[in-house]
Amino acid sequence: MLLSVCSRFISSPSAAAVIRSSRAAASALPRTYSSISATEIAERTKRMLDAKEQSGLSYDELATKLGVTNTYTAQLLMSQAKLTSETAIKLQEALPTASKQDIEDMQTTFPMRAFDEAILKEPNVYRTYEAITHYGEAIKSIINEQCGDGIMSAIDFYCDVGTTTGKHGEKRVVITFNGKFLPHIEQKMDDNSAKSPRD
């Protein structure tokens, strides 16, 4: 999945431009916006991944200690999700070499949930992307048939990655998407709480 996004973010020319503009604007922006410094985010990500490596814990083991999915665990370390105060305590205990400042910043900084397009050149990521796009129309058709006219939320959403063993003894990857169904609405005027620009 898209688990190595942040560690690769600063490698592209477009990211370099973002970094330069971010540095120039840093003094004028509140610290709670993660866009103030892409390099700062990338450096913190490296420190957190180093702390994970030093702990000897796998993503699955760390996820169990935190009580979240393994992909969400990876997102936390890669600054793709916001750390809650409850989970912060568990994370500090699980990764004792992680700095208190990094743990604090992970709670106060709003993530930039985006990715550098260069990540799609990574074969593992691209094949996952390819699978989703290849099966996309079929998946949409089945969602429509089973749930109606709408979409699967990626906000009220859980993602978990695991493995299983095939009938020939081979290891196989299992990726589970669990998202709330969000129906499209009929835009009735009586239900619109915003003032119409035509009024």
Question: For the regions a protein language model found, what residue spans apply to each?
Answer:
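N-terminal mitochondrial targeting presequence
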Residues: 1-36
